Amino acid sequence: MIAAPTQLAIMPFPNIDPIALSIGPLAIHWYGIAYVAGIMLGWFYARRLARTDRLWPNDTSPISAQHLDDFILWAAGGIVLGGRIGYILFYDMAAVAANPIRAIEIWNGGMSFHGGLIGTTIAMILFARRNGIPVWSMFDIIAAVAPIGLLFGRIANFINGELWGRIADVPWAVVFPTGGPFARHPSQLYEAGLEGLVLVVLLAIAIYVFKALKTPGTVTGIFVCGYALSRIFVEFFREPDAQIGYLAGNWLTMGMVLSTPMFLLGLWAVLRARSATKSA
């Protein structure tokens, strides 16, 4: 058994009530607010990108603001359904098989980013084909704004005191209410910074400085690669899901396994975009 590290300095957990507002029997959770805030701010930024013709191929945006207005419900459905189904398939299949009603108990389990990505991708393909939008351009505009949702979502994970990191003795380690007596890495904030803030800035630079939207698929590839690398890195500090644990040794996690093919897909998307541009 590995001994816990000696902890000389820790940060107190900011004990924020997961329920932001209660109106009678209705409880509004920070997690729900984070989802709504991420979608709405992403929608606002996406509308700005769609209105800026000079960023797109032939200086003409293939996506209108009305398209984005119509896509909000599609995106929400893809995120929630894909995220929940993905969590069940990747992390909680045994428990759901034993108690099927658990599948709809979103509060008793969680959501999977990888599942949400698959669900949103399906929604984007169907929406783009229905509205005559180039699929790669649809992917690009959503990829450009997705880190905003990730930023808010990971902060909400921290407020909820969930998905905490491994035991640590760094000065910024935190004792989480549900994480036992030892201080842990605030891995949710690591993810918020890398998958959220850093990635949205990198994508903005790619779009506004290097005109990445003019080569459809480039922004998508950068996002997918960036997320995958960030997630793999943070997995070294994040506690694996208790019902799965480590898949091999004392280091390989499900998050790493799911993110590795993501990186390869992102790299393929970037190379495909460059090849298509050269042959055009």
From Swiss-Prot:
Its main location: membrane. It is found in: Cell inner membrane. It is an enzyme of class 2 (transferase). It is a multi-pass membrane protein. Its EC number is 2.5.1.145. The keyword Cell membrane applies. Pfam families: LGT. GO terms for biological process: lipoprotein biosynthetic process. One of its GO terms (cellular component) is plasma membrane. The chain crosses the membrane at residues 26-46, 71-91, 106-126, 132-152, 193-213, 217-237, 251-271. A 1,2-diacyl-sn-glycero-3-phospho-(1'-sn-glycerol) binds at R154. Keywords: Cell inner membrane, Cell membrane, Membrane, Transferase, Transmembrane, Transmembrane helix. InterPro entries: Lgt. GO terms for molecular function: phosphatidylglycerol-prolipoprotein diacylglyceryl transferase activity. Pathway: Protein modification; lipoprotein biosynthesis (diacylglyceryl transfer). Catalyzes the transfer of the diacylglyceryl group from phosphatidylglycerol to the sulfhydryl group of the N-terminal cysteine of a prolipoprotein, the first step in the formation of mature lipoproteins. Belongs to the Lgt family. This is Phosphatidylglycerol--prolipoprotein diacylglyceryl transferase. It comes from Agrobacterium fabrum (strain C58 / ATCC 33970) (Agrobacterium tumefaciens (strain C58)). The gene is lgt.
